[in-house]
Amino acid sequence: MAGTVQNFYDDLSSYYHLIFEDWEASMAGQAAALAPILVRECGTATQIKILDCACGIGTQALGLAKAGFRVTGADLSPRAIERARVEASARSLNLQLHFADMLHLNAVPETGFDAVICMDNALAHFSCDEDLAEAAAQIRKKLRAGGIFVASIRDYDHLIQERPVIQGPSFFSDDEGRRRIVFQVWDWIDERRYAFHLYITCDTPTGWRTHHGVSTCRAVLRDELTSMLEGAGFERVRWMLPAESGFYQPLVLGVAG
């Protein structure tokens, strides 16, 4: 998953917050959706040790740390990790951060986590079943027996039927009234894989400016991901759709056997 995916998130690290209408509110809202699941499965928030294995600039890690969880973050993008460090420091949050690909989570020295999370469709970046299965195995090794894995992924069971070519656009404005437009264009490569072009166009004092990045994803269906997690040693794998969880994407949960 490294290489071009890393470059995509390195380049996006300075702009990532702009894909949200209000990043601070999104951090709080996503933490509020995830916290009850984690507490129900693992216990008291302040005693739960979490690894966010695709933390990016910290959207979930920062929100959960602020909610009292003990959070360690890892990501394949060194620039995203550096941004997360800056954001954690600005909020006086104790967030341990590591540069680590999901295929090489041994770069994170700690083990025995109560929970590992992997949000924002990160699992879809794996281009083949073999790499996705290896990532699941790496994640299992980071968990204590009985620990929980929680991941979010797009609803590809639905999207694979429609094969959309655009997501959005979304129109936002900041506190100063400056507008921005965020959307994705999807170019389908084959039945499962697509290149997505992310556009963030901002109204600046010197005119409109656009950030454009390209990466690839693979549509992984729910039964496929369930089978891979079970093959990696997870038990009681189950799904929570947004109507149940309050999270913006479907969630998959599995207990480390």
Label every model-predicted segment:
Residues 150-226:
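SAM-dependent methyltransferase
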Residues 133-145:
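A short glycine-rich, Lys/Arg-flanked "PGG" loop and its adjoining helix->strand segment in the class I
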Residues 59-105:
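Class I SAM-dependent methyltransferase SAM/SAH-binding core
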Residues 114-130:
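A short SAM/SAH-binding and catalytic strip from SAM-dependent methyltransferases
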Residues 107-115:
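A short acidic, Gly/Pro-enriched loop at the edge of an enzyme's catalytic core
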Residues 1-56:
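Conserved class I S-adenosyl-L-methionine
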Residues 216-257:
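C-terminal lobe and adjacent flexible extensions of AdoMet/dcAdoMet transferase-like proteins
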